[in-house]
């Protein structure tokens, strides 16, 4: 009789443990080339990166002493093909803080693999940014939400079941070291992808400015088609309050890099089956433009006071 076969099952992370004293990750060649190209145009070192969603790109006009770096002069930088998304980085100050605005984010439905979606974020991090404020336009699933409201993201559903992996960093060990170092210093309120304390402060600041906000869970789908009625019912059952086609890849990568994350969705429309109108991208842009005053007020106050 053959001896029994014993199986060893590992429940650990897929990476070997990395000492906390491991050297800092160095950018991969593609990222290093992009950093060099930006540094030829500005020596600005941002503290905060703001990624702007559909119809919200003109928030970058709020930057003081701006330096604009077009996406097409940055090697390896993905180019957006979506109306309302003009690809460029805008460096400057906002309420006295050093910032960089990412205008013209790219989406999975434009044909980019998930790791490419996070290249602009990784570039900003390599230039010095340690905090991410990300905005998007989303369809409202929660029946108490109305178009034009602003929702702070407290969690997400990754319905694309995709992950940026290691992005453009040098090796899995480097990113694992960053993740482990961040986890070792994270507070109990910062064990998720979104900084709940930053969110609490931001919502308080919004109330002070007279900007009413809500909180909720954001569902990411690949697009480009809007969701069917059946899909919206499914997402509602799963706990989603809003749905959109962006944000989650950047948030996942920001977390891996140890960045603090604050997410804001502009509810631009009722999701399919909850309203009577046919969903069009132009409508998303229109509502985004209508609410940009509130969002501008909110973002400036958040940058100044949190």
Feature locations, PLM:
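Active-site rim beta-loop-alpha module in soluble metabolic enzymes
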Residues: 192-234
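Metabolite-binding pocket within alpha/beta catalytic cores that recognizes anionic/polar moieties
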Residues: 21-190
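Generic non-transmembrane alpha-helical segments
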Residues: 37, 41, 197, 201-211, ...
């Amino acid at each position: 009789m053959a001896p029994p076969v014993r199986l060893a099952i590992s429940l650990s992370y897929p990476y070997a443990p990395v000492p906390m004293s491991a050297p800092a990750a160095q950018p991969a060649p593609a990222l290093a080339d992009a950093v060099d190209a930006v540094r030829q145009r500005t020596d600005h070192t941002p503290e905060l990166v703001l990624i702007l969603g559909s119809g919200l790109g003109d928030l970058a006009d709020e930057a003081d002493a701006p330096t604009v770096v077009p996406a097409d002069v940055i090697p390896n930088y993905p180019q957006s093909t979506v109306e309302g998304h003009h690809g460029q980085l805008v460096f400057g100050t906002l309420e006295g803080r050093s910032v960089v605005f990412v205008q013209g984010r790219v989406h999975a439905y434009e044909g980019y693999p998930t790791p490419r979606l996070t290249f602009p974020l990784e570039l900003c991090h390599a230039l010095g940014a340690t905090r991410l404020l990300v905005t998007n336009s989303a369809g409202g699933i929660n029946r108490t939400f109305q178009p034009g409201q602003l929702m702070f993201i407290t969690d997400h559903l990754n319905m694309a079941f995709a992950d940026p992996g290691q992005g453009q960093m040098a090796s899995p060990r480097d990113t694992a070291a960053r993740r482990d170092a961040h986890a070792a210093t994270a507070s109990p309120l910062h064990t998720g992808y979104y900084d709940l304390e930053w969110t609490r402060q931001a919502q308080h600041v919004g109330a002070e400015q007279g900007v009413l906000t809500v909180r909720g869970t954001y569902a990411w789908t690949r697009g480009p088609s809007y969701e069917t009625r059946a899909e919206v019912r499914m997402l509602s059952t799963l706990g989603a309050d809003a749905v959109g086609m962006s944000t989650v890849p950047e948030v996942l990568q920001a977390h891996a890099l140890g960045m603090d994350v604050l997410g804001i969705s502009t509810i631009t429309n009722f999701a399919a089956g909850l309203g009577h109108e046919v969903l069009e991208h132009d409508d998303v842009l229109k509502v985004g433009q209508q609410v940009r005053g509130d969002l501008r007020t909110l973002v400036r106050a958040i940058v100044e006071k949190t």
